[in-house]
């Protein structure tokens, strides 16, 4: 509002509005709230600055520490700026409250205005023979003064409040705490993956569709005209009793009706369906190309990071894997003593003290050196991690069968053929028989 507008209203209006308002209490409460918020921002900024400085000073060293400090520095700066903005907002609220108090003090009060009106009424009522002309003029001049004073006070109050409103800072949103350069990388990925919508193809198709609609419209109009001509021929033939003209009119009306129906009920819906289908195909193709086009671009950095994390771990296993190349040392092992004579005699059988286990496989000559190794199955290798036995392990020389009355039974693996221990055999039914 401007001064002439304030002058357009009587002083009673301005005085009543200022006196009946909420007063400066709400502005002062808001100023106190902004001051408390400013102090809170300052405390958080100070605490975070200490943490960031401690990290950069040696608590956490290396590139990660540098990235941490670089990521939090903008947030600390925002906290400091937010504290300053909150303090400025508190000051502007206090300035607006002070302007209100000054305007209320300078504004003519309602009792003063009422007294002026009462004095004017008394002077006018007692103005016999014009004796109160000068007092009435002075009274009216005083009212004009209060009118101008009220307008001036309101103009000044408006200027103070407007300046406070303009000077109040607006704090922006807090920055996102991210790795430096991450936004540029994401923007580059988005720019590389998002392709523009094919508006050129859409414009060409719509142009072709518009031309097709125009041709269909011409077909419909020509069919309507042909139907009208055929109807005139039909009526003329009926009136003049001309059968050929009636037949011609009926034929023209028939083909015109077919053309009109074809255009309205077939071609127009087909064109509409084609337009919708083309729009759907372009939109879906654009969306799919952008979605699947982002996978290789985004997958490259992810796979690179994964490879960087896995390769050092695999390289660290090279020392352990190298132990597998150590040669296995074979130690000659004799037949366990516990196996000799460990078979108890079976009731009903005959114990042969000189019984030997007969094998279908010829044993190796005594002069031949046989490498006897422990089997590679069992409790596992003991000692160094990664040691392994040789693949050439002594094989059993045959099978031992627990015979029954029918002469067959479940096969049991024999001991390695290179051991050749003397075992106790059981003859007869239920004895041990070598096959």
UniProtKB/Swiss-Prot annotation:
PANTHER family: GLUTAMINE-RICH PROTEIN 2
Gene3D superfamilies: PPE superfamily
Induction (record text): Highly up-regulated during the early stages of invasion of the human blood-brain barrier.
Coiled coil feature spans: none
The encoding gene: PPE47/ppe48
Species: Mycobacterium tuberculosis (strain ATCC 25618 / H37Rv)
Listed SUPFAM superfamilies: PE/PPE dimer-like
Pfam families, A to Z: PPE, PPE-PPW
InterPro entries in the cross-refs: PPE-PPW_C, PPE_dom, PPE_sf
Designated name of the protein: Uncharacterized PPE family protein PPE47/PPE48
GO biological process terms, semicolon-separated: response to host immune response
Protein family per UniProt: Belongs to the mycobacterial PPE family.
């Amino acid at each position: 509002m401007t001064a002439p507008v304030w002058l357009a209203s009587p002083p009673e209006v301005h005085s009543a509005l200022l006196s009946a308002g909420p007063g400066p209490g709400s502005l002062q409460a808001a100023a106190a709230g902004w001051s408390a918020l400013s102090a809170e921002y300052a405390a958080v900024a100070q605490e975070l600055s200490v943490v960031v400085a401690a990290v950069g000073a040696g608590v956490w060293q290396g590139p990660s520490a540098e990235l941490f400090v670089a990521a939090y520095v903008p947030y600390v700066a925002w906290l400091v700026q937010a504290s300053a903005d909150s303090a400025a907002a508190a000051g502007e609220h206090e300035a607006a409250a002070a302007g209100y108090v000054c305007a209320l003090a300078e504004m003519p009060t309602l009792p003063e205005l009422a007294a002026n009106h009462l004095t004017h009424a008394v002077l006018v009522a007692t103005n016999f023979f014009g004796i109160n002309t000068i007092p009435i003029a002075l009274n009216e001049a005083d009212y004009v003064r209060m009118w101008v004073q009220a307008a001036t006070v309101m103009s000044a109050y408006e200027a103070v409040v407007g300046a406070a409103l303009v000077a109040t800072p607006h704090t922006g949103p807090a920055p996102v705490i991210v790795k430096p350069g991450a936004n540029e990388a994401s923007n580059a990925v988005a720019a590389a993956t998002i392709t523009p919508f094919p508006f050129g193809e859409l414009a060409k198709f719509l142009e072709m569709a518009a031309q097709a609609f125009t041709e269909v419209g011409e077909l419909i109009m020509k069919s309507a005209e042909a139907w009208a001509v055929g109807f005139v021929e039909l009526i003329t033939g009926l009136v003049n009793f001309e059968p050929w003209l009636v037949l011609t009119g009926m034929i023209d009306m028939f083909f015109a009706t077919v053309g009109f129906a074809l255009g309205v009920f077939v071609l127009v819906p087909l064109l509409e369906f084609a337009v919708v289908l083309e729009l759907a195909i372009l939109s879906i193709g654009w969306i799919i190309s952008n979605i699947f086009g982002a996978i290789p671009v985004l997958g490259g950095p992810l796979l690179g990071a994964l490879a960087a994390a896995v390769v050092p771990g695999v390289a660290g296993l090279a020392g352990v894997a190298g132990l597998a190349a150590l040669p296995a040392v074979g130690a000659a092992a004799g037949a366990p003593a516990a196996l000799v004579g460990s078979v108890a005699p079976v009731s009903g059988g005959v114990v042969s003290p000189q019984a030997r286990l007969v094998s279908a496989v010829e044993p190796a000559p005594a002069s031949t050196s046989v490498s006897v190794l422990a089997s590679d199955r069992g409790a596992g290798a003991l000692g160094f991690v990664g040691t392994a036995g040789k693949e050439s392990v002594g094989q059993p020389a045959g099978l031992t069968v627990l015979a029954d009355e029918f002469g067959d039974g479940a096969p049991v693996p024999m001991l390695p053929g290179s051991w050749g221990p003397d075992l106790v055999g059981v003859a007869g039914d239920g004895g041990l028989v070598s096959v």
